[in-house]
Amino acid sequence: MIPRSYSQAIALTGLMMLVGLASSARAEVQEFNRRATATAQIMAGISPAGSDLALERRTKLDAFVEHQKWMAVQWSQARGRISAMQDWRSREINIPGTAQKTLLYPFSGPDFLNAYTLFPDHSQYIFFSLERPSSLPDLESVTPVQFGKLLEDVRNAFRDIFQRNYFITDYMSKQLTTPWIRGTVPVMATMMALMNQRIIRIEPVDLFPELTRAYEARDTVKHPRMIMRGVRIVFVSAGGGAQQQLYYFSVDATDKALEFYPGFLEWVGQHRPASALLKSASYLLHDNQFEKTRNMILAAADYVVQDDTGIPYRFLHQAPWQVRLYGRYNKPIKSLRYGYQADLKGAYKEKSDLAELPFPFGYHWRGKQSGLMIASR
């Protein structure tokens, strides 16, 4: 059974979000959830400061000492890339009124790292992809041996994003379904800890509870292959300031699958003004199976940062959009050759003054081969 009015539900949800953000902005120093923050810090290889003695004891174990060393080395290398991204962002990304903007990040996986590095001042972030959100692990309940396996799973989940600056979907299906690390929430929370954020709360979100109940019944109605699950993470910088929030939804975003959730893209698209981030997206928006998602982004966003795997260049190389190109264009990797864009290749050839992109972005991550575009209107 479909709810009588999606628009009413969507309007109410949006109002509640705005009220919450407005009230949080008044406080300079925010209280935070110490257990959730400490859990994220331990997974990030950071010894948490505080009075949570149960978790503090975990940091004395050899497994944590080993994990801390590994994370320190990997994060030190990643910090060089992030610093280059931050410097580039300060010069090239100029968005007025960012404190009231939403970042849309389709096919995101748990990639808070790139989203927050490029768009740190947005008030909220909306991610969606196939991977389940799940929840933080309970570090107090696991044995020392299990704790060691959990930290090993964290390292496995971070190898690709640290090395390549993107996640590999096929690998994530295994990395985020272990007995100890399940879903995107543990990875996003760990990234928040690495970026010096404090978690205020993590809570499930169900945009369409009537649909969820109907689809979970299964014997009463035709149901989707995967039922949408959502989560909201409210967080704040360790240095204080206004709260920010991240919505993450696991959903099949093909046009056919979205027929089961006809209000989802309407809900996402109502959050304006919006920016959009698209990277390492397997050229999904080049496929007519994702036409609804592509059209939603083109309608809702007035600022898009993407590599060549995002919205096809032909949709942006026209009024009212203005496009700036960075780095270089390379043919898609072997398994994704169908994403080749002759018009984008030509646009790069016409530019004689293109600066190298000083960080890896997308599938061509080796040897300064990456390209990126900013489209604005």
What are these regions (language model features)?
Residues M1-T13:
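Bacterial N-terminal signal peptides that target proteins for export
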Residues T13-L15, A25:
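Cleavable N-terminal signal peptides
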Residues L21-A27:
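Sec/Tat signal peptide C-region and signal peptidase I cleavage site
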Residues E28-R159, S237, Q243-R377:
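Non-globular targeting/processing and membrane-anchoring segments
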Residues S108-P120, I126-F127, R164-A189:
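Short, thiol/selenol-centered motifs that function as redox-active sites or metal-ligating centers
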Residues Y125-Q175, I200-T220:
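Thiol-based oxidoreductase modules, predominantly thioredoxin-like and allied folds used
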Residues R155-F162, P186, T190-N196:
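Long, charged/polar, surface-exposed segments that mediate recognition or autoinhibition
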Residues M192-E266:
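Active-site/pore-lining binding-face segments in mid-to-C-terminal subdomains
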